[in-house]
């Protein structure tokens, strides 16, 4: 059990309910699971566009699978490292992080993210992980002003990039476009960090750390050419969640692509099997030499067996590293893959990226979503007190009275939309043949 300070919530008063004996992290998991933001993930793009097929994964099913893998990793680590059992004492904590990790991602995946980042280019930018933190700590209406009011340790674990936007932003000459249709995502990649408005919450999360730990934890690598700075460190819990996320992305999204015929066994042989069959690790060399036959078999049970074999291989190959430069145990220890498995996971992720995500048909869907998001933002920003929903108008007006960042309210609203809702709203606003706006209710 870690220090009680990590169980604290910003709004200290707990809702006392009859015979409620749940742990703090079980409460966190319940708040995430029952939130509107989590439910909306069922209609948000994972890799393949919503509506292309009824088999593929959405961000909701992806998050559930990340949660399952995350608890599997945690169970393995508890067996391997009994001396660290006190740091791995709660499966509910890891589940909470895995369920919540994508909750801030906008409609249309990275196309929507780039679109919002461009529209917010003069107002602090936009990035999905930063929006996740914002939803958990401010926007989701479990409380009036504190979002879900989660424990400090859960919020520490969700921080993949524990520094603020202005600390990581690197000014670069980026041409503003004459038309939204000319926007290139490669020129408008977002800063990966916390929005300026949420910096006080970040400070609260990091309060228990020593000055030395905090300075090291929020430090960032110098950005390469045309790149923003990136933070160096994550907490133990975050490192487990990120490994679970990467495993699900590389393996389960691969399964979607196989079932839908987007990738072939010849592609697999060329890009994956030929590279990994010569691995120094005996298990990797053996499995990747032959597992393609099962992955691409016509019998579904053979493919599922192969997917299970791959997931198990990665989950059981995770170690814990110690960084003696940190005092706080939650920062001192991090999970990582054994080097041959880290290389194999990289090969799988690159395969999905090259053969699936960069496929022109997928990029066209992303491009279309990019246009929808930018045009919606432009419309709302042109006359927010006329076009925004009433409750969002109230937030916009409050922000205006405080001389705050009004465009952040618009970004909050659009980023919470599902793919389908954003597309229908765009049609209602810009298509002469669209029906009544009442249909959107």
Swiss-Prot record:
Keywords: Hydrolase. CDD domains: HDc. One of its GO terms (molecular function) is dGTPase activity. Pfam families: HD, HD_assoc. One of its GO terms (biological process) is dGTP catabolic process. Residues 59-250 form the HD domain. PANTHER family: DEOXYGUANOSINETRIPHOSPHATE TRIPHOSPHOHYDROLASE-LIKE PROTEIN 2, DEOXYNUCLEOSIDE TRIPHOSPHATE TRIPHOSPHOHYDROLASE. Belongs to the dGTPase family. Type 2 subfamily. This is Deoxyguanosinetriphosphate triphosphohydrolase-like protein. It comes from Shewanella loihica (strain ATCC BAA-1088 / PV-4).
């Amino acid at each position: 059990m870690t220090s009680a300070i990590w169980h604290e919530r910003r709004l200290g008063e707990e809702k006392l309910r009859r015979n409620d004996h749940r742990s703090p992290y079980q409460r966190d998991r319940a708040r995430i699971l029952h939130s509107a933001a989590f439910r909306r993930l069922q209609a948000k793009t994972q890799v393949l566009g919503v509506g292309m097929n009824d088999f593929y994964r959405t961000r909701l099913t992806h998050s559930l699978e990340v949660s399952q893998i995350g608890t599997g990793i945690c169970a393995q680590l508890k067996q391997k490292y009994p001396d660290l059992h006190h740091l791995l004492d709660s499966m509910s904590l890891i589940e909470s992080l895995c369920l919540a990790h994508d909750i801030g991602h906008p409609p249309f995946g990275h196309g929507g993210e780039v679109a919002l980042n461009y529209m917010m280019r003069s107002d602090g930018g936009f990035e999905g992980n930063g929006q996740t933190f914002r939803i958990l700590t401010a926007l989701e209406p479990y409380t009036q002003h504190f979002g879900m009011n989660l424990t400090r340790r859960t919020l520490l674990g969700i921080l993949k990039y524990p520094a603020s936007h202005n600390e990581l932003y690197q000014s670069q000459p980026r041409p503003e476009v004459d038309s939204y249709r000319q926007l290139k995502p490669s020129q408008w990649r977002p800063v990966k960090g916390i929005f300026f408005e949420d910096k006080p919450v970040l400070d609260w999360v990091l309060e228990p750390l020593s000055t030395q730990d905090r300075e090291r934890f929020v430090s960032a690598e110098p950005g390469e050419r045309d790149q923003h700075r990136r933070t160096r460190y994550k907490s133990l819990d975050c490192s487990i969640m990120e490994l679970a996320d990467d495993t699900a992305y590389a393996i389960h999204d691969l399964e979607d692509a196989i079932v839908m015929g987007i990738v072939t066994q010849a592609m697999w042989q060329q890009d994956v099997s030929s590279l990994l069959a010569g691995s120094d690790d005996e298990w990797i060399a053996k499995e990747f030499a032959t597992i393609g036959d099962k992955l691409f078999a016509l019998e579904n049970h053979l493919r599922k067996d192969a997917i299970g074999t791959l997931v198990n291989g990665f989950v059981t190959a995770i170690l814990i590293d110690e960084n003696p430069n940190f005092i706080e145990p939650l920062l001192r220890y991090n999970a990582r893959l054994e080097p041959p498995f880290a290389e194999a996971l990289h090969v799988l992720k690159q395969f999905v990226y090259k053969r699936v995500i960069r496929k022109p048909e997928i990029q066209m869907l992303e491009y279309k979503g990019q246009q929808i998001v930018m045009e919606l933002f432009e419309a709302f920003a042109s006359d927010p007190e006329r076009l925004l929903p009433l409750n969002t108008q109230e937030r916009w007006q409050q922000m205006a009275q405080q001389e705050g960042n009004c465009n952040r309210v618009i970004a909050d609203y659009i980023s919470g939309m599902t793919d389908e809702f954003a597309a229908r709203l765009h049609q209602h606003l810009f298509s002469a043949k669209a029906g009544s706006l009442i249909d959107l209710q």
